[in-house]
């Protein structure tokens, strides 16, 4: 028998095995649900959770340690079994469906085990491959974060990739469902690895100027880091590629015992200090509120103009380049801005690209930028553009 025929037989056998496993898992799921209903009948309480689908997925991936991390509810409880309870039940199943699909794909060897991550972003599903060479880099960084034993690690969008790497061990698989609409109680965090959006935590604009300044005329990373290290509580990070000497460094500060991130965005009279104020949502880069204009005196007119032209019904406005009159293209990075809305909340997203990429034109989607341009200098909590730059947050 020739090799292609053998492959077809193997694929067919895998499909048959998968179908049998699925039917068995679904049958066991139904039996378990009925049993649970009987047990809880006296309490007049019907509870639905993810146990059934997790059981099916574990059946598809025997011997593998499966951990589910979701910031969306994966269970529902109702005083009685009614139509609303069934709707909630279906919602739970729908939320877990990406996990199920991924398990099937791995079981059929459609997607390599170590190359799978599944998460949702604004209701859309993404299948994202992982570059193997990045795994040890990001794993090490995340291990340093975890060594501080934070109470909560909150991640959305592209940041999920980093956390996925950290848990990536032989014989284990991590899957995530991420909902960008998650509202976070900031007081539940022991440490916050993002900027802060709570007005009670953020400093006033005049406080920012006292926190962080560095001379952007320094010629090398070593010089910048030396000056940068003069400030307490800074997280300097680790820089692998000296060619990024013009990249703006990140700093952490503590306000009211909470940590936040500061980003220098260029220079005015050789020194600039700007805090980007925002919360980590679904894009993997900084989401900043419209109130940010109070921190950008030089760009205030421009931002107010953008806000005035912004329509709340628009999901995303195409980004516009922002270059201060005091900045020269030879000296500065280009700053891209886009305005978006999440529910009834309007936000401005800031991120940086190199002058060269700016002049060539670049996609407005930061994730696409990371994929298409190896050299992009991209400011976002997920951090490293294609692994060429990394930092720690411990």
Curated annotation (Swiss-Prot):
Organism: Dictyostelium discoideum (Social amoeba)
Main location per the UniProt record: membrane
Compartment(s) where it occurs, according to its Swiss-Prot or TrEMBL record: Membrane
Domain Myb-like: 325-377
Annotated protein name in UniProt: Myb-like protein R
One of the record's GO cellular component terms: membrane
Record keywords, A-Z: Membrane, Transmembrane, Transmembrane helix
Lineage top rank: taxon: Eukaryota
Transmembrane domains' residue ranges: 11-31, 99-119
Membrane topology: Multi-pass membrane protein
